[in-house]
Amino acid sequence: MLVACGGNDKGAVQGDGWTFSPPAGVALDTVLMDDMEMNNPFIRYEREDDCYYMVGDGGYMWVSSNLRSWVGPYDVLCQDTASWIGAEPVITSPEIHKFGGKYYYMATFERPDVMVPDAEGRPFARRSCVALVADDIRGPYRTIDRGSSLLVESEMAAHPTFGVDHLGASYMIYTHQGEQNGDGTVQIVRFSDDLGRRVGEAYIMFSADENQWSGNVVDGERRFSPVMEAPFLFITDEKEMGILFTSYIGGEKAIGVAYTQTGEYGYNGPWTVEQQPLLTGGVGSASIFTDYDGTKVLVVGKVAVADGIVKCRPQLFKLDMQFDKLKIEGHYKF
């Protein structure tokens, strides 16, 4: 049931005898987008094979030729178990980015067997971010540097995304989580040329306490949420740089936006968080892809409760990015 897309069947076998196939003991399935259950969904459209690729929590890949029906799950990771990731990490919030002719699978890897302290000194499973590399979008994605943890080992980091500056240097943007520092922050660190190590130390772009719309009103007092997660970098047609992020309002997830004041490559800021959320109603983990006709599409995870069961499904929205700030035009029809 390998999806060819655009008449270009890449074949099931990639180099080293590795096979683009489902996890052991799991059969391939075809799932309609409306029935897909996935936390932290991320979609990438590849013009070379006219195909869509979706990844999410769990680390597996789904493939589609039309956005409506998806074939999967495929196991695309071949990480080095001797690295800090270990043999059985919990994988969340993956993204796939192309840079320098290669594909990079960036994700949060959690080690339930390794503890770090939270803000109160209580033990918390170690959680950090790393990039894996492949020559093909379908993998296999392999460890770049087994001896590098990339980020500070004691830091609870999650939700990595990718950026490039005007000199071609690459960066990881991620969150230092509020459970540990009490005020979640969006941070940036420069990659080495192969994206396997960091160059220098990370610095803060903006923090949860700058987000004035988040949190709850308790006893007449506004209590802001320390949650700041799922950053995603974008640039408008007017060359203004922004970052999507997720926080909470009234106990539900919502998506916000921050803009830099220094143009297309304004990583250093200053950053200003918009006074109102971009999207509310239990939505989070926003990202953007460009469709075959140039349409900019917002991908979010929509959380809903049915019969006491919490489910998250991908939702797509059409974006207008032609001015200095992005706007949602409505649900994306495909």
Q: What does each model-identified segment do?
A:
Residues 1-3:
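Sec-dependent bacterial lipoprotein signal peptides
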Residues 5-334:
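Carbohydrate-active catalytic/glycan-binding domains of CAZyme proteins
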